[in-house]
């Protein structure tokens, strides 16, 4: 890992699931061989257990006593790790990189993407903030907080809506963001909400910009096969069906590049895939490449206004993606108001 850490972002080590005695034994070895400080350990705690499902993930609202477990973990970490030293190292790293980047003041822990250039963009665009409707419910709930903050930093106004519980997308929407989640567990409810399916399809057909990742991408298909093997009609924007392959289809980090430039300004964007479901129409607008092994495959449906595919993108790795999407929403806003 250290060989790929070109920005020296790894500044210390905490040994997980080890006893304090083993930690004391390994600390001098690790510090000598790796040149990194060992900041402590986190012993095995039988009382701490997080349930999982087929993707290894359950939502916080599904787990009873989660806050209690988090507090227990925090108390144990305070006992077995040097948190004061960790904070000192983090501040030193931030100061070093602030000077490297030409800043003279120690940066506060700020919202990702809100550097000087982005703030200037936001100030210029405050008078015309396009509304981005973000799907958020039991079916669509996977979002990087950094991504949402960056959308706001570039001038987007986020509003939430539920494809499960509402009849149509928000009237003020200028763009759609359909994130990942577990639509396969809610396939029947999503399918039976015909008015929402029609609302999304008609909005996209009428030119509304949209981004759909993983679960959101699945929802845009003609149909989805649920865990019991039953097919359910979906939004019908993308031809084809999504179905469970019974194994991990693609897993891990990738760099995604476009075949023809639309969203990414000629640069890659970092992404992550982790899914058992697959599509018989994954798209061919982009190429995803594993950073170490170099394994690659085609993916993504895109044009100037739409980006649909399985990869979960990390927007700060290529802010051009956000800039393009927000600008597309702004143009749609103007077009709609001009009618």
Positions of predicted regions on the chain:
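Internal gly/pro-rich beta-alpha loop/helix module
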Residues: 1-124
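Residue-level signal for short, function-critical loop segments
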Residues: 17, 136-138, 241, 313-314
């Amino acid at each position: 890992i250290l060989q790929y850490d070109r920005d020296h972002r790894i500044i210390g080590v905490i040994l997980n699931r080890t006893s304090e005695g083993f930690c004391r034994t390994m600390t001098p070895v690790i510090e000598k061989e790796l040149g990194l400080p060992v900041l402590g350990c986190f012993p095995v705690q039988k009382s701490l257990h997080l349930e999982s499902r087929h993707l290894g993930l359950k939502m916080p609202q599904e787990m009873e006593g989660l806050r209690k477990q988090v507090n227990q973990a925090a108390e144990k970490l305070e006992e077995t790790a040097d948190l004061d030293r960790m904070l000192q190292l983090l501040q030193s790293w931030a100061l070093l990189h602030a000077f490297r980047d030409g800043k003279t003041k120690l940066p506060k822990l700020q919202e990702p993407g809100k550097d000087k250039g982005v703030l200037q963009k936001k100030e210029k665009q405050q008078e015309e903030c396009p509304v981005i409707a973000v799907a958020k419910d039991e079916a669509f709930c996977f979002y990087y907080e950094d991504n949402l903050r960056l959308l706001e930093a570039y001038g987007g106004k986020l509003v939430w809506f539920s494809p499960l519980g509402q009849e149509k997308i928000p009237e003020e929407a200028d763009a759609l963001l359909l994130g990942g989640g577990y639509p396969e567990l809610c396939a029947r409810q999503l399918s039976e909400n015909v008015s929402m399916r029609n609302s999304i399809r008609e909005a996209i057909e009428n030119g509304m910009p949209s981004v759909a990742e993983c679960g959101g991408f699945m929802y845009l298909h003609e149909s989805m096969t649920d865990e019991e093997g039953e097919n359910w009609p979906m939004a019908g924007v993308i031809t084809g069906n999504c179905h469970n392959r019974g194994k991990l289809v693609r897993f891990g980090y990738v760099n995604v590049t476009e075949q023809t430039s639309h969203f990414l300004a000629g640069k890659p964007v970092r992404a992550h895939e982790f899914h058992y479901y697959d599509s018989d129409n994954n798209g061919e607008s982009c190429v995803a490449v594993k950073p170490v092994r170099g394994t690659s495959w085609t993916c993504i449906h895109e044009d100037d206004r739409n980006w649909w595919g399985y990869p979960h993108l990390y927007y700060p790795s290529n802010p051009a993606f956000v800039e393009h999407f927000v600008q597309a929403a702004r143009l749609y806003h103007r077009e709609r108001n001009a009618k």
